[in-house]
Regions:
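Active-site hotspot residues in diverse enzymes, especially metal/ion-binding acidic/histidine motifs
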Residues: 1-72, 77-175
Length: 175
């Protein structure tokens, strides 16, 4: 069972007193280092969670979940690094491919195979605990696992671990 934790501002504190920076703060720092300006409480006319225009990212102020804000910022940064032009209409195959590229960037940034193993090493044995540990929504984690399943098949090995995607997420330490 993971150590319990609580949040103050942009830092996470474990009950044992250890403090870690949240991924959201890391993404904000990465944005700044890449000269990307983030408007954290944007007032959108659309229902989008996040939008990017050039080097300006807006995060919809209606998003209350900290994990959802993290996932949204990661995906918008993925667009900054991997897409070209306006793809908001999703009207072409190229637009869909660029959207997927941005999502894959976000999956790998926030989760990745190492993140799955780290969650396991920290006692996470359910999707809820794993998502909580990785600071992502369960929906985002499930979408990432579906992508990884499509890319790697039923399982993949990483160092001395086997990560199973079917029938459900599982991590096995190899001897």
């Amino acid at each position: 069972m993971p150590t319990s934790k609580y949040r103050i501002d942009t830092h996470l504190f474990f009950t044992n007193g250890e403090m870690i920076k949240l991924k959201y703060e890391d993404l904000l720092e990465e944005s700044k280092a890449s000269n990307v300006y983030v408007i954290e409480n944007a007032d959108f006319k659309s229902s989008a969670d996040g939008l990017i225009n050039g080097n300006v990212i807006g995060i919809n102020r209606k998003i209350q979940s900290f994990c959802k804000r993290t996932c949204t910022l990661a995906e918008e940064l993925g667009h900054y690094y991997t897409t070209v032009g306006n793809i908001t209409g999703q009207s072409t195959v190229s637009d869909h491919k660029q959207e997927l590229r941005a999502r894959i960037w976000a999956y790998n940034k926030l989760i990745g195979l190492n993140g799955i193993v780290n969650a396991y090493q920290h006692g996470c044995h359910s999707l809820h605990d794993t998502a909580d540990y990785l600071e992502v929504t369960e929906e985002f984690l499930l979408e990432a696992l579906q992508y990884y399943r499509g890319k790697y098949g039923k399982y993949v090995t990483l160092d001395n671990y086997a990560i199973y995607f079917e029938p459900s997420l599982g991590v096995l330490e190899l001897v």
